Amino acid sequence: MTEAKKSLKRTLVGKVVSDKREKTVTVLVERRVKHPIYDKIVIKSSKYHAHDENSEYKLGDTIEITESRPLSKTKNWVATRLVQKAALV
C-alpha cells in the first residue's frame, strides 16, 4: 500500500511589519484568546520571520505563511500567498 502522506504543516495569516531584510519578511500574527480568570477576550500576538524568495511582499500586506524546515537561525516559515494588498495612503 503506497499512500501519499498528507502534509500537516501549519498555516497562519498575518500582517507584514518589516521587509528590510533581503528575501525575508517579518509577519505579525494576532490571535484572540479568552482570559482564564477574567473571561475577557485578549489579543495576543507573535512575530515570525518568513522566507520571501522574490521580495514581492511589502510593508502592510496581509499574507499567509506556512511552516517549513529551518532556513536560518530564526526563519522556519515561508510566505505562500498574498491575502490582501496594503492600502495606499
Curated annotation (Swiss-Prot):
First and last residue of the signal peptide: none
Pfam short name (any one): Ribosomal_S17
Gene Ontology biological-process annotations: translation
Single GO term (MF): rRNA binding
Record's keyword terms, sorted: Ribonucleoprotein, Ribosomal protein, RNA-binding, rRNA-binding
SUPFAM superfamilies, per the entry: Nucleic acid-binding proteins
Listed GO CC annotations: cytosolic small ribosomal subunit
Family recorded in the similarity comment: Belongs to the universal ribosomal protein uS17 family.
Subunit: Part of the 30S ribosomal subunit.
Function comment: One of the primary rRNA binding proteins, it binds specifically to the 5'-end of 16S ribosomal RNA.
The protein, known as: Small ribosomal subunit protein uS17
